[in-house]
Amino acid sequence: MRWKNKKIPEGEFMEMREEILQTWPTGKDVDLKESIDYLKKIPPEKNFAIKLEQADKEGITTAQPRAGVPLLDEHINLLQFLQDEGGADFLPSTIDAYTRQNRYEEGEAGIEASKKAGRSLMNGFPAVNWGVGPCRQVLEAVNLPLQARHGTPDARLLSEIIHAGGYTSNEGGGISYNVPYAKAVSIEHSIMCWQYADRLVGFYEENGVHLNREPFGPLTGTLVPPSVAIAVGVIEALLAAEQGVKSITVGYGMCGNMTQDVAAVISLREITKDYMKKFGYKDMCITTVFHQWMGGFPADESRAYGLISLGSTTAALSGATKVIVKTPHEAFGIPTKEANAGGIKATKMVLNLLKGQRYPDSRVLAQEIELIKAETKCIMDKVYEIGGGDLVEGTIKAFEAGVIDIPFAPSQYNAGKVMPARDNDGCIRYLMPGNLPFTKDILDFNRGKLEERAKADKREVDFQMSVDDVYAVSSGVLVGRPAKR
């Protein structure tokens, strides 16, 4: 029998928790009742859900970096620097690669190796290895809300530790933290794991603790058309709502054409709210997060700042509640704290200048919103149809059939038949739609837009367009044109 989209009964959930908390020694320090009391004492300005909702009411776009190092004191120093020097509105703990794959013994070895070397030898903060107490030390050392950001298909123990440790938001989902990150984890297993993470948040919510959940919007971060990304975000939001989550931040990764990106953020918010209403989820707070460019970055620092500023502009004009900040060292790997703060400051400058402004209405914007909503509806309708009305069943079958198909994903459970490319204006269209359940009108529109570009490029509509587009932005252009001979 497959897992279903049903709220996990409390008794069954508590039995599951006993097993999960035994998977690493730090799990024994999680005490739900004590954690509820601790979380209730966190002031509103350090609660992720409360602060996000306030920003949303005021129409403000906030800024959050990515950051994480393995040693506790260094991690605290890093976050304090991004808070004080960078001016971040929210703080992260980006979790290391070992923890993401539940390889806690190697995480422990990485901490010890980093201590001996006197420098970071891991790409994030191993929260499970440190445990509840040290996570609370991080929270108590800063003045801003904390969120765990990672990429973990099975984040059950991690979720227990970070929430008990005072983190009031957790990023991820059963699709977005599996298909773009893992090769051999089934959709059913990762959805089940994230239903647990969501049920934990729902339990806290039932006991008076308001926590935020954030599906990972960019997916593979490489030419992902808006409707596929939005469908995944809506599915993960609905799965979370079923488990009792009330504060959900749906996300989207910058594609590059500002009109399409603004249309996508507007559509994302409206579609998510519509589905919440349709299925009877009440008292929901839906906010949005816009991710600055997730693809290849220019190596030149000044050009990198230009790309960061474009993303900041789009985030502000789209009305996104939050923007995830990149750094000018993105092309080289893990940034210095100074470079990270520089990205935040550049972002905040743009956000402050554009405060209160919105992208003007136009016929082109309205058409793009209409198209995104129509494409997303095709996907969602088919998911519910093949699942017999059950969202989990439908999602599993949708991946099996290629009804949901994420471009450039490593997962063996992803069909990999969809290929995107930019049109002549830089909007991302479906070059090869695979088995996506679109109408003929939608398919014809996508093809027509790509034929317009092919005519301008003096070439055929083919896979080389996609290849050229993947490398274009890092070379300083949006659309990958053929090399002049």
From Swiss-Prot:
Reported cofactor(s): adenosylcob(III)alamin
Q: Which GO terms describe its molecular function?
A: cobalamin binding; methylaspartate mutase activity
Q: Which residues bind L-glutamate?
A: R66, R100, R149, H150, E171, Y177, Y181
Keywords tagged on the record: Cobalamin, Cobalt, Isomerase
> Cross-referenced Gene3D superfamilies, in alphabetical order?
3.90.970.10, Methylmalonyl-CoA mutase
Family stated for the protein in its record: Belongs to the methylaspartate mutase GlmE subunit family.
Protein's name in the database: Glutamate mutase epsilon subunit
Q: Which organism is it from?
A: Treponema denticola (strain ATCC 35405 / DSM 14222 / CIP 103919 / JCM 8153 / KCTC 15104)
Q: Which gene name belongs to this protein?
A: glmE
